[in-house]
From Swiss-Prot:
Membrane-spanning intervals of the chain: 36-56, 76-96, 103-123, 130-150, 171-191, 302-324, 346-366, 420-440, 442-462, 536-556, 568-588, 968-988, 1014-1034, 1072-1092, 1097-1117, 1192-1212, 1220-1240
Tissue specificity: Detected throughout the gastrointestinal tract, liver, lung, pancreas, bladder, gall bladder and at low levels in the adrenal gland.
Residue ranges, Extracellular side: 1-35, 97-102, 151-170, 325-345, 441, 557-567, 989-1013, 1093-1096, 1213-1219
Region of interest: Disordered: 903-923
Reaction catalysed by this enzyme: an S-substituted glutathione(in) + ATP + H2O = an S-substituted glutathione(out) + ADP + phosphate + H(+); ATP + H2O + xenobioticSide 1 = ADP + phosphate + xenobioticSide 2; 17beta-estradiol 17-O-(beta-D-glucuronate)(in) + ATP + H2O = 17beta-estradiol 17-O-(beta-D-glucuronate)(out) + ADP + phosphate + H(+); dehydroepiandrosterone 3-sulfate(in) + ATP + H2O = dehydroepiandrosterone 3-sulfate(out) + ADP + phosphate + H(+)
Extent of Polar residues compositional bias: 903-915
Organism, as annotated: Mus musculus
Membrane topology summary: Multi-pass membrane protein
Cytoplasmic side stretches: 57-75, 124-129, 192-301, 367-419, 463-535, 589-967, 1035-1071, 1118-1191, 1241-1523
Name of protein: ATP-binding cassette sub-family C member 3
Domain ABC transporter: from-to ranges: 626-850, 1287-1519
InterPro entries in the record: AAA+_ATPase, ABC1_TM_dom, ABC1_TM_sf, ABC_transporter-like_ATP-bd, ABC_transporter-like_CS, ABC_transporter_C-like, MRP, P-loop_NTPase
Phylogenetic lineage: Eukaryota, Metazoa, Chordata, Craniata, Vertebrata
Amino acid sequence: MDRLCGSGELGSKFWDSNLSIYTNTPDLTPCFQNSLLAWVPCIYLWAALPCYLFYLRHHQLGYIVLSWLSRLKTALGVLLWCVSWVDLFYSFHGLIHGSSPAPVFFVTPLVVGITMLLATLLIQYERLRGVQSSGVLIIFWLLCVICAIIPFRSKILSALAEGKILDPFRFTTFYIYFALVFCALILSCFKEKPPLFSPENLDTNPCPEASAGFFSRLSFWWFTRLAILGYRRPLEDRDLWSLSEEDCSHKVVQRLLEAWQKQQNQASRSQTATAEPKIPGEDAVLLKPRPKSKQPSFLRALVRTFTSSLLMSACFNLIQNLLGFVNPQLLSILIRFISDPTAPTWWGFLLAGLMFLSSTMQTLILHQYYHCIFVMALRLRTAIIGVIYRKALVITNSVKRESTVGEMVNLMSVDAQRFMDVSPFINLLWSAPLQVILAIYFLWQILGPSALAGVAVIVLLIPLNGAVSMKMKTYQVKQMKFKDSRIKLMSEILNGIKVLKLYAWEPSFLEQVKGIRQSELQLLRKGAYLQAISTFIWICTPFLVTLITLGVYVYVDESNVLDAEKAFVSLSLFNILKIPLNMLPQLISGLTQASVSLKRIQDFLNQNELDPQCVERKTISPGYAITIHNGTFTWAQDLPPTLHSLNIQIPKGALVAVVGPVGCGKSSLVSALLGEMEKLEGVVSVKGSVAYVPQQAWIQNCTLQENVLFGQPMNPKRYQQALETCALLADLDVLPGGDQTEIGEKGINLSGGQRQRVSLARAVYSDANIFLLDDPLSAVDSHVAKHIFDQVIGPEGVLAGKTRVLVTHGISFLPQTDFIIVLAGGQVSEMGHYSALLQHDGSFANFLRNYAPDEDQEDHEAALQNANEEVLLLEDTLSTHTDLTDNEPAIYEVRKQFMREMSSLSSEGEVQNRTMPKKHTNSLEKEALVTKTKETGALIKEEIAETGNVKLSVYWDYAKSMGLCTTLSICLLYGGQSAAAIGANVWLSAWSNDAEEHGQQNKTSVRLGVYAALGILQGLLVMLSAFTMVVGAIQAARLLHEALLHNKIRSPQSFFDTTPSGRILNRFSKDIYVIDEVLAPTILMLLNSFFTSISTIMVIVASTPLFMVVVLPLAVLYGFVQRFYVATSRQLKRLESISRSPIFSHFSETVTGTSVIRAYGRIQDFKVLSDTKVDNNQKSSYPYIASNRWLGVHVEFVGNCVVLFAALFAVIGRNSLNPGLVGLSVSYALQVTMALNWMIRMISDLESNIIAVERVKEYSKTKTEAPWVVESNRAPEGWPTRGMVEFRNYSVRYRPGLELVLKNVTVHVQGGEKVGIVGRTGAGKSSMTLCLFRILEAAEGEIVIDGLNVAHIGLHDLRSQLTIIPQDPILFSGTLRMNLDPFGRYSEEDIWRALELSHLNTFVSSQPAGLDFQCAEGGDNLSVGQRQLVCLARALLRKSRVLVLDEATAAIDLETDDLIQGTIRTQFEDCTVLTIAHRLNTIMDYNRVLVLDKGVVAEFDSPVNLIAAGGIFYGMAKDAGLA
């Protein structure tokens, strides 16, 4: 390099230590300034160029119009290029004229000139790629200015020293160059205008990050405006920025889906290759081990999806880790500087500045790393939620039965969140070993081979912690199973809460949940104890390493002296070593939890999907809309086929009826046409779009209009036609908001008939080619059914000309169909036109002979008129066929099955859909819909975010839940461990000063022993505090869950009608998870960072009292940042919590309606809807992540200032301080940055997580029902004895502010009397039963049973003495015994007797498990009739004096109806029976009939008298053919 600089007047050496270091006026040689210093910016730009160009090529952000700013920057670049060339030409000029300039004067202008040309071109290329602020060029210009400052000073000092300017030309060009690069730096700090054609331009509220300048992005200053806004007022949804394109769900999910698809393809190829025959020998085949089927790896799919983010974060993390080792080296030099009185003072100031600069750079890069990794974590969670949602849309029905909604919601809420939680620790897998290796390397440099002793400690402790983590994983797996069971049970309880209240069964289910919860908490406790042991091991590890290393060092050789430099540089290295070791427990815990979640998610994603090719859409015979050729179908591969060898051809435009007995496969046939069943063989072809009306009407939680439109654009004419033909116009007049009325979850505020008609209107509006109608007429009365058939389905209806497949029970419409398919035993037994089937004289004709007279008379007469010849033919045929007699077993059985299936049309009102929902919706009509508002028709209340500070009462509640003594003990233990840590370090400082004061170290054993004792004391106190926290946290988790559970079980029915179950489940899943597993570690980390911060300030002030001067300003700045941050982050967290519930509510709703969604081809629309809800959640999550980074940069700046001032004051007071105190002070200062950051973070996290307590407490304090038992007013033993029921001037409303639904009702029912209750929909029939059980409380008046006012006794004393057979026969998952007798009060003989009387004993006896037969969720594995008989058995077991039948037989077949009515007449002969009836024939022999009309008693007399009077009841009886 010296030759490069030449010799002579302008020549110099490249480096001169006396000039640059060992002097009080340091400078660099001209050669160094003109060469390496000038080249540094150029080297940087050329090094960064390849990666930057690659980035720009793959990130087109738009096009920026040429602006004055761009022109100025370009002009400056050109001028700098010119200045460099002028310098170069001047050197050539000198060479020509014989002055022989040094080579550096040719090389440097050439290098700088080319680099300036590159910078100029880069300015324009960035403009074309839409870059508003270039970080690469800002750093380049900054380096140019920094590297030019030294020559700037040197040239002036040289000119002053020499009295003249040695090289006036280069002197002038340099200052021109300096002025230009300084201007370029200033201009580059200003950002360009937004680019054209950018998506950001269309955004009304874009995230400012996208257009922020380089320094703003580096320091997260762009977040400041939102922080100020959040400080001034609570943030709202409208304040949140839109998501950038790359963060949106549709982008992120698609990337993961593509990666997952590749994994599936690879796995399938691997299996195919394994399965290929290679013609081996017989022995080889027999002896060869069976190859394991290779499953696609979800982990690999995740890694491939987020590779770029992982690599970017790894780069940031690597730089940050390397920078972490700079300050210990600077500390070493600083201590040596303090020890050397002859060292120049500027060394100390330079060291202080370098320590500040190093810390600041580390801060900036650290938070770029965190931002990168947390944004990746957010995208990861979004992608996993999206993939789970998409999978749920296509899983088979058998998988749906295995994976309940609660379990799938857990995958989304808990398991996806765990991946997000563990993501920030992923890089520890490689960075922790790197940091440990580097720390040990530097320790070796200081302490020599003694450092290996510390390595040995680490190596020995790793297996111990590994064993602990494996045990933790075992507990984690078990705990998640209990969590799933608890959530599943809670989901069932919430969906069947009304049944539990009516039967007074809440205590039984309460105990079930508490039992599961107890098991879950036991595993949590064990896991937490193991976590505490793991924490103890790793907290003690750095200290043990320090102790043993220093002990070995001083004992291995007497000449080894522990001085301040060795002690505190080692200590700072050990503190660095402590970070990865302390994080390892969290990493292990997080990875353990994530591995469990990974397996759960992977297992779910590998479940079977419906075959999209099951139904062919193109190849079909001409003239036909639907064909099935040799079709055999099953619901699951491991189950026998449900439908066998079907051969069906349905012409275009035909109306086809499907009839048959119970379980024959009618609904299965519709499902097979939809592709919902698994096809074993055959071909199914469907040509055209499909509309589907299921047995169980699926209604969304949105407005009635949105339910009908179902995502299609509004066509007013078609919409009006759909409402009119489906008889919905009259309902719109009653609904508070008309068609804008919000329909509650699962259509809870509509009657069964209204739900079915909305479902039918959706189909009509869809204007599809093919309509699959699964029994849509069973849920409406006879007149409405006739209207719908005539106006919609029939030959003259709006669907005339469309292909219609109608599953039906009634026979009055069959003559108008084009042909009929009769199913029996999963096969087509007969098929043909109505008249042809009559001529065939099979089971269909036999059924008509027996049950046609029971049909509605008017409808039957119409049928006779329309098919007179067919009926005459029927009479003739039946009279001549003697082989169809009842003594033929096969024929009799078919007839019996038909009898079970066919139901007479209802006489009035609307009945519930014949197939009960899987989840309990609401069996009782909602005449006055409980929570409607007249103005808006909104039912579900919006979840409101709390604002302002979290109330101190919430913290107090949690502290009390933990136990006040426990809370106080934890704080004292943490304070004690901090004191022990300070004591150990102060002792180390004194030990290191022994060598300074005495030249050697005496009392080494004492020094080492005390140091060891203090360290061990610290470790023990940490472990004690962790164990104490476990005790308190588990107790708090138990009490808070218990309070929530008890309150919700006791909440009134109106609460469940107005609150989505997803919102309640969110409390039991996500919020309880936070209380269980997140809150306690957060508190421990807060205490740790708080005491560390306090102890650091105390040590620094004690070491350098001058530091007191800056403590107050830094504390003010710290408090200022903290107040801004906490206010904003708290509200962002609340908004995130509020926006999370709709994701799960929508998911639950989607899973129950997948068949409808698929049938209408709306899968893509629902994906978009789910993505929208997830994106809305991300809109609050992303600013929350940014707020943490904003906090980190600003707080760590305060911490860096602490480092700066600690070092500066050490330099200033070097004459009065010993090296030990300086080492102690600065080493503590180096820790304070992280401690201050974590303290605010943990304060905020505590506030964010304590919101879970707030939300749980909120739902633990909602209004409850009356007490279950009033000890001071218990009902007499054996009450009621007679069963006399009186309503005295009774009025009721659903809630304050609404109209009365029953008005001044006065009714007296004698004991043992049988009373039927009838009336049109909305008359108040079911309201009476709600009042009798006190589901609704009186507005005025009273109900008296056997002389006792029911309002004066406990709810369970009342409800347990009444019996109801509800319209919806709800069963719960569990044994049949539990569903009959949840309290275990009855003997096995009693239960079998009840089963015998309810005609279920044959079925139960045939089951291998008998009474322990496992009922599926909702009783899904039993038929509707069987479920209703179970309800009858419940009533027989209870055998109370008052029995209520709430339309109990409206949705079941005739035979089951006959069985129930016969049993009721015999077994409840002496009981009071109140029957809400739709089938008037069931109450014609009752003592009296109560007719309600608009909430008042219209008629009340015997059936005979009421018919004779010719009033409302007479009209109903006439409609039913009974008068």
